[in-house]
């Protein structure tokens, strides 16, 4: 479950920076989009999942550079170099390797698709101040979404409602920027020797 939580954190994060979806705030979104396109951006977030079972809470750190990203939280590391995704469980010494996925559900296995193609998956249902309610164009895991900005155009929060009834809430506590780094920095740093269970689905 935790690996899915971390992926949806990234989905909410990327939903803020689509340069085309929120046309009503074009100048602010364009500036934010350019910032993410030209820098290595680090986010520190809190997340919670509410639904049929006990509430799940936690913290995570995300780094994004173009379509590459690295997420750390809940005992998992998720790396993506823009072509492949590594889901690493350091405790159990297991790793799953996946190729990026295209199509309407591609954002589940490749949330980076939202950076440039969110408008292919969602429509803006309503706008209230700096809060945007989004509606998916096709039936899938996400049934509704709501994202919000600060007056300065910074990321604030996002809530995604899932088809299983769970509601995912993400709050952005801190955002920093740094110069871009080589894409090899988005590969796992650990060597997967014989002590690891490796599932390569590419």
Ranges and model annotations:
Residues 12-22:
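Hydrophobic h-region of N-terminal signal peptides that target proteins for export
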Residues 2-9, 19:
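Bacterial N-terminal signal peptides that target proteins for export
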Residues 100-130:
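Flexible, surface-exposed loop/linker segments and immediately adjacent secondary-structure boundaries
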Residues 45-49, 70-74, 131-138, 157-161:
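Short beta-strand segments that buttress and anchor functional surface loops
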Residues 24, 128-130, 138-144, 152-202:
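Non-transmembrane domains of secretory- and envelope-associated proteins
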Residues 20-56, 65-67, 188-202:
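N-terminal leader/targeting segments and the immediate start of mature chains
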Residues 61-108, 168:
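An acidic-aromatic
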Residues 62-70, 79-84, 127-129, 148-156, ...:
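Short, solvent-exposed coil/turn segments at beta-strand boundaries
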């Amino acid at each position: 479950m935790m690996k899915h939580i971390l992926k949806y954190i990234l989905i909410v994060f990327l939903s803020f920076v689509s340069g085309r979806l929120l046309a009503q705030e074009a100048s602010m979104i364009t500036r934010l989009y350019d910032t993410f396109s030209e820098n290595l951006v680090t986010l520190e977030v809190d997340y919670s999942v509410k639904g049929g079972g006990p509430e799940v809470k936690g913290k995570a750190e995300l780094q994004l550079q173009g379509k590459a990203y690295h997420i750390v939280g809940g005992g998992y590391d998720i790396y993506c170099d823009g072509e492949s995704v590594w889901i690493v469980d350091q405790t159990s010494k297991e790793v799953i390797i996946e190729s990026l996925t295209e199509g309407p559900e591609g954002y589940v296995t490749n949330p980076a698709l939202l950076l440039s193609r969110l408008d292919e998956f969602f429509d803006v249902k309503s706008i209230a101040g700096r809060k945007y309610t989004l509606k998916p164009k096709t039936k899938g895991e996400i049934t509704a979404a709501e994202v919000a900005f600060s007056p300065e155009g910074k990321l604030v929060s996002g809530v995604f409602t899932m088809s299983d009834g769970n509601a995912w809430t993400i709050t952005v506590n801190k955002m920093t920027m740094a110069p871009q780094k080589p894409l090899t920095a988005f590969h796992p740093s650990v060597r997967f020797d014989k002590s690891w269970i490796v599932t390569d689905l590419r």
